[in-house]
Amino acid sequence: AALYHAAALRSCYGRAAAHEVELSDYADPSQTFGAMPIVVECGDELQLPPVPASAGLFADRRQAATEHLAGVEIFKQKDYVYRLSTMKRFTDATQITILTKMRRSGGCKLTKQEWKAVRDTDISAASATEQRRRLAGTELWYQAAPTWATVSMAQVIRPRLSAVKAAATLFIVPAKDYILNRPQNPRLTDAYLTEVISSIPNMNNTGRLPSIGLVHLGMIIRLTNTVEAPEAVTDSTGEVVGIDLDPDEPSAATEHTSAIEGIRILHMQPIITVKLHGVRTEFLPPVSCTLHAATSACRDCTSCDFRAGCIAVEAQLSRRSFPVEVQDPGSDTWYTIQVQRRQLPMTIKAASTINTLQGVTTDPGLIFHWKFPRFFSSELRWLATYVALSRPPSLAQLISVGVPDELRSIIEAGPPEGILSRFDDMFKEKEEATHIRAAEVMRELGWDATD
């Protein structure tokens, strides 16, 4: 909510000089976002809250800061609120019915066939032969989970499968971790400390930098930190189109760093060129064709490459250190060391946390691990379930691992009351008025409301 307030205010700063906007009126209904004549916002209230949840627009406001409260009030100033009811992503009638029942206030029972369709996505109890059959052809599928322990595993599995599919060399890039307060203990060897530090799965605890980077030409990646605002920002996606090794990197011909063919472990951190999705900005110098090599790249030449949307991604140093608990292997003594990490700020797009999965259509498919963290409330379990079941276009494109016994009751219970009531408190009256007004406009235009 505080971020929403900041966005509304900064939009006024940007438009004040050109449009004579009065900054002090930025929170008035007609003046928000710099008096933009039309502001359209799209979203789904049935999504996981931000981290921390207290920052969300639907969070408890009793002890919220002034900026938070201002953001909520600006958010509530919508003229029209319309809830879309037709899901265009899906091709599976059973899946649509299940999701419709999930959204029904008060809950709704699944039929035996509907529950069987969910259970049949689970491969946990299948034989090894059947699991291999079901997993065949899923090299480019998404793999996601609510826990970082599983996601960190997927961040290794998906690049290897993607590299095999692309017939490309997979480069392994270990992070450079710097210990700022190393204890004077000979048993805490470099190898031991490296293993302990690299075993931390949650990238939120490591400056959003992975302990091991894996990359190959053609891999679809997600940036884990901002590289170049406002376009190459956190969670931007793109394709790896270039891998420039450090000049001091040992030659692959003289140093065999991996016994597995097609994998190369790097000693130095490379520079990765990524072509960002949906971006046309020219961040890098153009590459001239042979004809224009002596002069400069020509805009009219189809062979000259201006590398639109391409950006060079270098290793970043985490902005602050992070704590790591280390046990003395020879005693019960524990140390808290502070570590700062340098690493490429990227990971494969297909390995995803449940939060990052929101808003994504997981095409060609999704492998989902149904293990909820113990701290997940009933509300978070329902939201995570809804997100997982609503990402793939069909249940045939969902492979489940470890469907819990409680999943059916989660689905049938319907959305937790708090989610619905918080949204209705803000927008129920406006939503009803919007439907009435929409019907009137359609009649005025002569449109058929049944289309």
Segments from the language model and where they lie:
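Conserved ATP-binding/catalytic motifs of P-loop helicase motor domains
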Residues: 1-451
